[in-house]
Amino acid sequence: RTYIDTEGIKGVSIEPGFGNSLLFDDEAYEPLYQLLEEQEMILMATFSGSITPVLDPSLPGRFQKIAKNHPGMKAVAGHGGGPWVREMVCAAFFAENIYLAPDLYSVNCPGWQDWRDAAAGLARDKILFGSSYPLCSVSRAVENVKEWGLFPEDERKIFRENGAGLLGLK
């Protein structure tokens, strides 16, 4: 709480299941989620089947549950929630506070076409740009999004507007 007040921190990043046995909806995270909601802050959760020994920690319902239980907290699924792309797109569409950052999984990974479709359609306001540098360079991440073949206004949302809105910079 001290750093929120003195440093203007906008959010916190967690990695459930990576080096620990916690799941998104583990009660141990509840005080953090409550604080983030009270302060209207951002939760950036690394969300990917590739970082955990089993897929259970990354099930979309767990992430959706905490977002719905804390509507004042903005919840970003880092790596976009893969491999559960379609499920996460639906979760973001139905929950005002869920955002998706597909970053290095934006092309040539299972479900990447769903990112493209979501960015051009029902989740166009929920897709955030990211690279996961150094795993994927910023220039490569930009090229990946451009490969989606979106209209310029949809690219603008991904590259700037959606992130600016999330951070309260609009």
How would you describe each model-predicted region?
Residues R1-I51:
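Active-site gating/metal-coordination segments in enzymes
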Residues V54-F63, V85-A95, P110-A119, L135-E147:
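Histidine/acidic-residue-rich catalytic or RNA/ligand-binding cores of hydrolases
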Residues H79, A101-Y105, L122-S139:
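Short acidic/histidine-rich active-site segments
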Residues Y3, V12, L36, H79, ...:
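Conserved, mostly hydrophobic/aromatic
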Residues A123-K126, S137-K170:
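Mid-to-C-terminal alpha-helical segments outside catalytic/metal-binding sites
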